[in-house]
Regions:
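Short C-terminal tail/terminal secondary-structure segment
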Residues: 2-9, 26, 158, 218-222, ...
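Active-site helix of classical SDR
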Residues: 132, 169, 177
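Canonical Rossmann dinucleotide-binding motif of NAD(H)/NADP(H)-dependent dehydrogenases/reductases
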Residues: 9-43
Length: 258
C-alpha cells in the first residue's frame, strides 16, 4: 500500500494546523498531507532542516501558500515557542497542534545509560509536553477552542524487551494527554492521542533489523505494518469537528489492543 493522495472532504476547512516532526514520509509527513487535503493551512516543523525544506517544497507544489515551515528541536523551549508564535503570526491563529516528535531505540534496562534514558524521555515525553503547553497557551489566549493530537504508541500499554525508555515515555504521553484534557476542557480545547502499533517509518528501518521487522509484522492480525496515512487518517478525525465530544482519549490505531 502506498501513501497516495486521498479525496478530501473538507474536514479541516479553514483550520490552521501545526505538525511537528513532519519532514519526510513518516506519520508526521502523512498527517501534514492529509490535513492539507482536508482544507487546512499547515505549519510543518522538524529538526532536520534540509528534509523539512524538501517536504515543504513538495507540499507547496500542490497546496501553494497553505504550507509554511520552521525548523524546530522540541527539546529546546525557545524553539518550541518560536514555532507556535511563528505559525500563529503567519496564519493568524492556531486551531490544531499535532505532536508527532519522538525518539526510540533498543537497549536492555541492564545496559541502558542515563544518557539513553534521558534523550528518549526528553524528546518523546518532555518535547510533547513543551509543544502541548505552548499550543494550549496560544489557544486559550485566542479564546475559540482548539484541538491537540499527540502521537503515543501501543507500547504505552504493552511491555516489550529493550523498550523501557520508549514505553515509559509513551505511557507518559498518554497520561499527559488525559490530564491536559481536563485542564483545558473549560476553554473548549480537546486533547487526544493516537496509539499506533507497528507503522512503516524510515527511522524504524534504520534502527531495527529486517528480520525483527518481519517478525513484528507477522504478529499483527493483518500481517503487516500500518502505512503512515492510515495513522494520519485517525489523527485528522481527532483534529476535526467530528470528534467534538472526544477529549482525554487514546485511540489505538492497531489491529490488536492493547
Amino acid at each position: 500500500m502506498t501513501d497516495t493522495a486521498m479525496p478530501g472532504h473538507g474536514l479541516l476547512d479553514g483550520k490552521v494546523v501545526v505538525v511537528t516532526a513532519a519532514a519526510g514520509t513518516g506519520i508526521g509527513g502523512a498527517a501534514a498531507r492529509r490535513c492539507l487535503e482536508e482544507g487546512a493551512r499547515v505549519a510543518i516543523s522538524d529538526q532536520h532542516h534540509k528534509r523539512l525544506a524538501a517536504t515543504r517544497d513538495e507540499l507547496a507544489a500542490g497546496h501553494g501558500d497553505r504550507v509554511w515551515s520552521l525548523g524546530c528541536d522540541v527539546t529546546d523551549e525557545a524553539q518550541v515557542a518560536a514555532l507556535v508564535e511563528g505559525a500563529a503570526g503567519h496564519f493568524g491563529r492556531i486551531d490544531v497542534m499535532i505532536n508527532n516528535a519522538g525518539l526510540g531505540g533498543t537497549a536492555s534496562l541492564l545496559d541502558m545509560t542515563d544518557e539513553q534514558w534521558d534523550r528518549v524521555l526528553d524528546v518523546t515525553l518532555t518535547g510533547t509536553f513543551r509543544c502541548t503547553r505552548a499550543a494550549l497557551r496560544q489557544m486559550v489566549a485566542q479564546g475559540h477552542g482548539g484541538a491537540v493530537v499527540n502521537n503515543a504508541s501501543v507500547l504505552g500499554w504493552r511491555a516489550q524487551p529493550g523498550q523501557a525508555h520508549y514505553a515509559a515515555a509513551k505511557a507518559g504521553v498518554m497520561a499527559l494527554t488525559r490530564c491536559a484534557a481536563l485542564d483545558v476542557a473549560a476553554h473548549r480545547i480537546r486533547v487526544n492521542a493516537v496509539a499506533p502499533s507497528l507503522a512503516v517509518h524510515p527511522y524504524l528501518a534504520k534502527v531495527t533489523s529486517e528480520d525483527l521487522l518481519a517478525e513484528l509484522a507477522s504478529r499483527e492480525p493483518f500481517g503487516r505494518a500500518a502505512e503512515p496515512w492510515e495513522v494520519a487518517n485517525v489523527i485528522v478525525f481527532l483534529a476535526s469537528d467530528y470528534a467534538a465530544y472526544m477529549t482525554g482519549e487514546v485511540v489505538s490505531v492497531s489491529s490488536q489492543h492493547p
